[in-house]
Amino acid sequence: MPTVYFEDLQIGSVFLGRECVCDKEEMLEFGRRNDPWPFHVDEDAAARSPFGGVIASGGYIVTLWYRSLIEIYNTERASWAFLGGLEWHLRFRAPLRPAETLRAKLTVKDKRPWFTPDRGAVMLYSEVLKLQGEVVCTVDATVLLATRRGSGLGTTAVAGAEVH
């Protein structure tokens, strides 16, 4: 499987993750275990809430976002050379309801060499989108990726994720 290194990513590149469905039972169970507000776990109470029905917890939305990103970061086509995340800034824009489908859209906003030559910082902007185009959540993230030098490879890797 090819590896995507710091040098392989181009500013402005856009990647689309796989579609993920908000499964009602999974969403409710996540809410019961992790975020038990009535509008996440109780359909009757949620119907009387400002949301007019049960909605996904922000934590569950982040889980689906990450599932969608796996299509970009780590598939049989390519694996990104992640060393770690430095920071995330999340903004929730719209509720996610059962049976709605979403996918992640990831844009490389900027990249900079790190303090050591074996890695680089990549600034990413991600939108979690419903299929109709409504933005559920946005994420600004800065991550560290290995360089080819840091991996010990001197050859150019082929980026395998689908670019749109």
PLM regions: where:
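HotDog/MaoC-like acyl-thioester-processing domains
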Residues: 1-10, 95-164
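Conserved hydrophobic positions within beta-strands
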Residues: 19, 65, 92, 106-108
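Hot-dog-fold acyl-thioester-processing enzymes
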Residues: 1-87, 150-164
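Acidic, glycine-rich active-site loops and adjacent beta-strand->loop/helix elements
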Residues: 86-89, 108-110
